[in-house]
Regions:
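Sequence-level motif detector for i,i+2 pairs with an aromatic at +2
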Residues: 120-123, 238, 393
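Conserved helicase/translocase motor-coupling segment
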Residues: 387, 391-398
Length: 398
């Protein structure tokens, strides 16, 4: 805590908002005096003691517009100029320059470039304040809208459909799940004691079914049981949406928000990635390995017990090989699980505040957790039991 992990992420997310507002009119909130409110304000108080300035510089690698200079984000404060920053970091980019000290924020990207980036990628942020309303919480203590019907909203050019920061999306994802389930079901007609599909292409129906199965696979990994989504009859009391075990058709959960806090948080996180990709291109919900983008997650282990951290999270991340995940974590179990599932070369670990690249077992939280375990009675009794098995005569086997 306090080493700057969230500060780094806040600059990345701020660049998302600054980039998005170049094209989308609803990406940021307007100011009465003109311009827009910053997602991240520039606070000189954040300058470290003993230094006179701070800055953040981000250069994106943009395959969507190879003929244009990639998007550039720079935020600075204190006794430093843009030209100073360029010189310190050997940055040879002509589109940004300046000799003025003090607070300044710059984002270089064209409207067309931004439109293409958001159209072809998932860009989102799951902050530490992400929250899912518990099923037991009274409505008067939590303001939320219920969207439990197939989506009928229009899309408007110039408006951002996928919110950058993701908060309490259970109902929104449930509405979308109803759309996915509806698309995966065909009209059935009876003819001469037989049933057949009508008004739909079998090939298209199978593709839509795959989108549904991708979401069912995510939930199956989280729950640890093979489950599917079931729609109850409209005449029956209670939720129409059930989570059912495939093996015996037993209802595991009567509705999505009956999952545990950790389970629903995980499902919403990865379902939202598919939801956003689906909004851009419906085929992306079918082919998860083709979803591209950047997903930023602060404190990914939030609400998750040890098994979800070590075994489940890495499996879910592995389902999206073309997504760049930028994650902060205090959990050594999560990193061990990532190494076991994806291999050492599939991800990089940087320890703050110096930004040093380290291997998993050099992570300070791992060493600290190990030291805590050594102090337990269970650890000491296991060591003593092991010591009793060592022969007292002859050469020890090393």
């Amino acid at each position: 805590n306090g080493t700057g992990k969230s500060t780094i992420l806040s600059n990345i997310v701020d660049s998302f908002y600054e980039m998005a507002q170049k094209h989308f009119m609803n990406a940021t909130t307007p100011m009465e005096s003109g311009g827009h409110n910053f997602f991240k304000t520039i606070l000189p108080d954040e300058i470290h003691s003993g230094t006179s300035y701070m800055y953040s510089f981000l250069l994106y690698n943009c395959k969507e517009s190879p003929d244009e200079e990639p998007p550039i984000y720079l935020c600075k404060s204190g006794n430093v100029t843009i030209n100073d920053i360029k010189e310190q970091n050997n940055i040879n980019i002509s589109s940004i320059s300046g000799d003025v000290q003090g607070n300044e924020k710059v984002l270089k990207a064209s409207s067309k470039q931004v439109e293409t980036i958001w159209k072809e990628n998932v860009i989102c942020y799951f902050g530490p304040d992400r929250y899912e309303q518990p099923v037991w919480l009274g409505d008067s203590y939590y303001i939320a809208l219920d969207y439990l019907h197939p989506k009928v909203e229009d899309r408007f050019n110039g408006r951002l459909e996928n919110s950058i920061a993701v908060h309490n999306v259970t109902n929104l994802n449930l509405q979308w799940l109803l759309d996915v389930i509806a698309d995966s079901r065909g009209d059935i007609i009876g003819e001469s004691d037989s049933l057949s599909l009508a008004h739909v292409s079998t090939a298209n129906l199978l593709l839509m079914r795959q989108a549904r199965e991708n979401l069912e696979k995510i939930l199956s990994i989280i729950i640890g049981k093979d489950v599917y989504f079931h729609l109850n009859f409209r005449s029956l009391y209670g939720s129409r949406f059930h989570i059912v075990q495939r093996e015996n058709d037993d209802i595991i959960c009567p509705t999505l928000d009956s999952l545990s806090t950790g389970q629903i948080a995980l499902f919403n996180m990865f379902a939202t990635i598919i939801h956003y990709a689906d909004n851009n291109d419906i085929t992306k919900s079918i082919l998860l390995n083709e979803i591209t983008g950047i997903v930023v997650i602060d404190e990914i282990e939030l609400h998750l017990h040890s098994k979800l951290q070590k075994e489940v999270l890495p499996k879910l991340i592995a389902m999206f090989p073309k997504i760049q995940f930028i994650i902060t974590s205090h959990s050594p179990l999560f990193l061990l699980g990532m190494r076991e599932t994806l291999g050492e070369d599939a991800f990089d670990v940087y320890e703050m505040p110096k930004g040093q690249k380290i291997n998993v077992e050099c992570f300070s939280e791992f060493l600290r957790a190990y030291n805590y375990i050594k102090q337990t009675q269970k650890f000491n009794s296991d060591i003593q039991e092991l010591a009793r098995t060592i022969p007292t005569e002859g050469k020890p086997l090393i």
